[in-house]
Amino acid sequence: MVDGLVGSEMCIRDRFNAKLYAASQTFDEARHVEAFNRYIQTRLKMMYPIGNALKSILDKILTDPRWDLKFIGMQLIIEGLALAAFQSTRELAKDPVLYDMLGLIIRDEARHVTFGVNYLEEFVSTLSEEEKNDRAQFAYEACLLSRERLLSTDVFEYFGWDVEEARQFQLGSDLIQHFQ
């Protein structure tokens, strides 16, 4: 994921400061991956690969040839989802290590989203209505895909559970209700 972030953000046209920010953000993301990896390995001792829903969102974003849609997808959608998920998890965290770690990561993620909003605000003002509608449709479709990323259907299948029954149960859970 970090490689995709670097590649998509280095496509930022002719903005040296934006490229420097993207490099800094890439460092942040690598630090986040390492923090989560260490936390999961030492505290939970169980790790699952990236889920199909999140993978499909990333594939949609990173395979689009237009730099601005990659930027919208990564800076607003993925970073926004991460920010919301980390905030919800932090509110419910009982482990003080996780709570503190998420506080630091949330600070970074909020900065990343703010950068995306500020950078795109200027760019979007140069687009035609048709181009704006195309970007809005892209973002909408990515958001539709993102709904499913909270549902651990890959895990349900792994344990041999009825996927639809487990999905409906999870949709009614306090965590999902809190996140929404």
Identify the role of each PLM range.
Residues 52-76, 92-93, 141-160:
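Acidic/His metal-coordination segments adjacent to aromatic residues that form catalytic metal sites
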Residues 26-49, 116-121:
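Conserved alpha-helical segments that form or flank metal/cofactor-binding pockets of metalloenzymes
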Residues 1-7, 11-12:
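Single conserved hydrophobic/aromatic residue that forms the stacking wall/gate
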Residues 75-83, 99-116:
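Alpha-helical membrane segments in multi-pass integral membrane proteins
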Residues 129-180:
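Extended, helix-rich structural scaffolds rather than catalytic motifs
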